[in-house]
């Protein structure tokens, strides 16, 4: 694939981010798991908030077409304060020294072209630049493609967390990578 450019998304990118997330939601449905399949998550409000807070990043090809997205936050995630297991680093959302990855997706037309790897590499670069000691992420236990990617990128499964939003299947495998 030609070069992938990654940049912080702005308000005008919201429709493109939403499209990529719908593509990701459809790909997850094809796996036969419930992640992102109940209710409206992720929705317009989630994307608009990510963009407004500077947490949303967009991967594009040389024509400017949206290929993938990732939400990267340095604010801590209270959901991660209660883990059935143990994090590799000892920090809570109140004094977060970790970056959190959420809402990652790739347009199905761009699958297997290194987009997610590029997004994760940029997230790691930004996390290091921000002085984070680690990165955390979570995914559905049945999302084997994402679990495999996290492990290939050096993340360690640390236990399970429970989502705080309304979800009939709230258990997620929690991962951390020490930087």
Indicate where each model-derived feature is located.
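Conserved GNAT acetyl-CoA-binding A-motif
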Residues: 127-139
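A short beta-loop-alpha structural element at the N-terminal edge
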Residues: 5-19
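Conserved beta-strand-loop-alpha-helix junction that forms the acyl-donor binding cleft
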Residues: 111, 137-147, 166
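Conserved acetyl-CoA-binding loop-helix of GNAT-fold acetyltransferases
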Residues: 106, 112-125, 148-152
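Conserved acyl-donor/pantetheine-binding loop and adjacent beta-alpha core of acyl/acetyltransferases
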Residues: 71-105, 166
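Conserved GNAT-fold acetyl-CoA-binding loop/helix
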Residues: 18, 25-46
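Conserved active-site alpha-helix within GNAT-family acetyltransferase domains
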Residues: 117, 129, 141-159
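Conserved catalytic-core motifs of GNAT/GCN5-like acyltransferases
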Residues: 77, 138-139, 151-172
């Amino acid at each position: 694939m030609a070069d992938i450019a990654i940049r912080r998304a702005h308000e005008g990118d919201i429709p493109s981010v939403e499209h990529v997330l719908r593509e990701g939601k459809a790909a997850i449905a094809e796996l036969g798991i419930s992640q992102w399949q109940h209710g409206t998550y992720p929705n317009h409000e989630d994307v608009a908030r990510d963009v407004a807070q500077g947490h949303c990043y967009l991967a594009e090809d040389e024509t400017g077409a949206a290929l993938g997205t990732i939400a990267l936050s340095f604010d801590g995630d209270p959901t991660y304060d209660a883990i059935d297991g143990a994090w590799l680093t000892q920090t809570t959302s109140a004094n977060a020294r970790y970056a959190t990855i959420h809402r990652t997706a790739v347009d199905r037309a761009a699958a297997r072209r290194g987009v997610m790897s590029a997004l994760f590499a940029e997230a790691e670069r930004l996390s290091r630049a921000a002085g984070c000691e680690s990165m955390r992420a979570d995914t559905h236990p049945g999302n084997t493609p994402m679990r495999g990617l996290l492990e290939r990128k050096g993340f360690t499964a640390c236990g399970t967390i429970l989502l705080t939003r309304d979800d009939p299947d709230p258990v997620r495998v929690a991962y951390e990578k020490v930087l």
